């Protein structure tokens, strides 16, 4: 059995956890915006097609 030590993990590293969550959220939004641009909207690798999406007519 491992001995437990009162090491303050959350108290010390909370800024890194918050920053990691913010970066994850920002990259997710950037990827969504990028996949819906004119250049990539009809790419067969777009996740929209896995959900049954149709091709979009681009001007």
UniProtKB/Swiss-Prot annotation:
The keyword Transferase does not apply. F-type ATPases have 2 components, CF(1) - the catalytic core - and CF(0) - the membrane proton channel. In yeast, the dimeric form of ATP synthase consists of 17 polypeptides: alpha, beta, gamma, delta, epsilon, 4 (B), 5 (OSCP), 6 (A), 8, 9 (C), d, E (Tim11), f, g, h, i/j and k. One of its GO terms (biological process) is protein-containing complex assembly. InterPro entries: ATP_synth_F0_jsu. One of its GO terms (molecular function) is proton transmembrane transporter activity. Present with 6540 molecules/cell in log phase SD medium. It comes from the Eukaryota. Belongs to the ATPase j subunit family. Signal peptide: none annotated. It comes from Saccharomyces cerevisiae (strain ATCC 204508 / S288c). It is a single-pass membrane protein. This is ATP synthase subunit J, mitochondrial. Keywords: ATP synthesis, CF(0), Hydrogen ion transport, Ion transport, Membrane, Mitochondrion, Transmembrane, Transmembrane helix, Transport. The chain crosses the membrane at residues 9-25. GO terms for cellular component: mitochondrial inner membrane; mitochondrion; proton-transporting ATP synthase complex.
